[in-house]
Amino acid sequence: MTKTVLVTGASSGIGRAQVLTFLENGYRVYGVDKDENPVFLNELRFVKMDLTGDLTPLFTSLPEVDILCNTAGILDDYHPLHETSDEDWEQIFALNLTATMKITRFYLQKMLEKKSGIIINMCSIASFLAGGGGAAYTASKHALAGLTKQIALDYADKNIQVFGLAPGAVKTAMTAADFEPDGLADWVAEETPIKRW
């Protein structure tokens, strides 16, 4: 039986790479993103929407999944707390944490009924240390790591596998916009054992 996968943040970066990998391996893949479906991914079943809004269209078009990849997220331009507005804080938490919680909660119900499922949350190196982002991003990713650990514990005996991936700097269009203009990319590469990002 072909497994069904949902990838959030499917149009670019890590999410796009996940989509390509699952498609290459024969999975039925659904992607959701606020940006357009990349034109070369015609076999991707795509839902264009803002995950911080009403999620009903997503849940209606895809009532259950076997594998959930919560990959959508945003950075915060490395702002310290005194430069972070309430609006910026809330926007980052709305996508990086709250949307993931709501999507996971919905599909978790179906996974519990089937007694099977895999949830992969895209945490970050900023989930475990400071300096991987600004105050809002780092706090949101710490919270996501906590949520991931708790649901992994809560559903371990229900045949639901929960994983939190915590990559360091990955070169994507989103990170390049933050890293390259001020030479941060060079510093990241120097601080990384493989000397690249």
Model regions and ranges:
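N-terminal Rossmann NAD(P)H-binding glycine-rich loop of SDR-like oxidoreductase domains
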Residues: S11, V19
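Alpha-helical segment proximal to the catalytic Tyr-Lys
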Residues: Q109, L153-D154
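Residue(s) in the substrate-gating loop at a strand-loop-helix junction
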Residues: S124
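Conserved NAD(P)H cofactor-binding loop of Rossmann-fold oxidoreductase domains
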Residues: A72-D77
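Substrate-binding pocket helix/loop in short-chain dehydrogenase/reductase
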Residues: H79-L81, D88-F93, L184-V188
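Active-site helix of classical SDR
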Residues: T104, S140, T148
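Short, flexible catalytic-loop segment of classical short-chain dehydrogenase/reductase
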Residues: P167-A177
